């Protein structure tokens, strides 16, 4: 999949089938739209192109009221590639784009910049300054300028409309199974493993210098307001052949010293329950990991001192092991029933 920053690019000369949106989370509704776009593009012999925005337009207009982020740009692009998208155009959402008229958006960006021949949009799609452009305007312009326009109605699961807002609601309330149902996969965060304070390896260590305590794999979340936060049962992918069971903290770590320079930064800190020997030595630093958040244990807590924090982490690890054991037992019972 090719990625372009902006629409004025010498390699964006081929006519395309296009859809436009924020695609936060790339949920099942997005996936259905992309499948429809891919089918139409194949029929017409066109590449599948997606135009998205960074930052989210609502972060530009009202940063204090902007929605929490489900996925980073990295994770969004990864999921778009999995959906068979050929090209993604990432438009920086700045003043010029915010003030552009709907007519100029069609003429300058869609026609001149992206060479559209077919455009698929959602039933609530709006564009241009003041959100004046809609499906009817786009369809009329297509008839006059030589490109086809179609729209897709809302996608529903169990009678409920699938949307990024619904995913955010499930994540904010810790309903991870509901979020996975809407996403079509477990909610996950990926990124490079980065160095932290290395405080975790001291907590619960067998001796002050042993470094065998609750060491963590740390990933930065690029947005200050993630859709989920708290303590989670997780699986870590990408560092070993098999996924690693663990427990993770996603948030700002309120138990850190107020003077700590890292306090307030959003991190995903994952403690692997059973560290492989090679990973325990080299720590996975610099590698890309994907962490699936499977079950929420509780919100972030502020502990009164390191001994209390150590006891809290130990309890979280025990609860995570119990959750995995319960899931394994349920899977085994289901397998037995299927064989009968």
What is each stretch, according to the model?
Residues 197-340:
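Phosphate/ribose-recognition catalytic cores of enzymes acting on nucleotide-derived substrates
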Residues 68-76, 100-106:
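Glycine-rich, highly charged phosphate/nucleotide-binding loops
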Residues 7-72:
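N-terminal catalytic cores of NTP/NDP-binding nucleotidyl/phosphoryl-transfer enzymes
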Residues 96-214, 304-317, 322, 328, ...:
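Classical nucleotidyltransferase
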């Amino acid at each position: 999949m090719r990625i372009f920053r902006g629409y004025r690019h010498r390699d964006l000369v081929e006519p395309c089938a296009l859809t436009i949106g924020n695609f936060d989370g790339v949920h099942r509704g997005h996936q259905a739209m992309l499948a429809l776009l891919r089918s139409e593009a194949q029929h017409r012999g066109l590449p599948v192109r997606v135009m998205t925005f960074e930052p989210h337009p609502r972060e530009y207009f009202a940063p204090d009221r902007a929605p929490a982020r489900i996925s980073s740009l990295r994770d969004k692009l990864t999921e778009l590639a999995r959906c068979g998208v050929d090209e993604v155009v990432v438009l920086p959402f700045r003043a010029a784009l915010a003030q552009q008229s709907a007519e100029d958006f069609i003429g300058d960006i869609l026609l001149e910049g992206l060479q559209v021949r077919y455009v698929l949009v959602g039933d609530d799609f709006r564009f241009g300054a003041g959100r004046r452009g809609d499906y009817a305007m786009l369809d009329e312009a297509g008839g006059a300028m030589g490109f086809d326009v179609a729209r897709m109605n809302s996608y529903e699961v169990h009678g409920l409309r699938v949307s990024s807002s619904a995913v955010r609601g499930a994540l904010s309330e810790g309903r991870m199974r509901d979020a996975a149902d809407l996403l079509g996969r477990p909610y996950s965060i990926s990124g490079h493993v980065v160095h932290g304070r290395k405080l975790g390896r001291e907590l619960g260590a067998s001796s002050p210098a042993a470094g065998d305590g609750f060491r963590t794999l740390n990933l930065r979340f690029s947005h200050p307001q993630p859709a989920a936060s708290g303590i989670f049962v997780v699986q870590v992918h990408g560092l070993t052949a098999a996924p690693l069971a663990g427990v993770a903290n996603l948030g700002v770590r309120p138990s850190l010293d107020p003077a700590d320079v890292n306090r307030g930064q959003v991190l995903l800190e994952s403690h692997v329950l059973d560290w492989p020997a090679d990973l325990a030595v080299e720590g996975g630093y610099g590698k890309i990991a994907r962490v699936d958040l499977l079950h929420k244990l509780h919100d972030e807590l502020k502990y009164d001192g390191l001994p209390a924090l150590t006891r809290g982490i130990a309890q979280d690890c025990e609860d995570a092991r119990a959750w995995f054991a319960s899931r394994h037992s349920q899977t085994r019972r289901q397998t037995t029933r299927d064989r009968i």
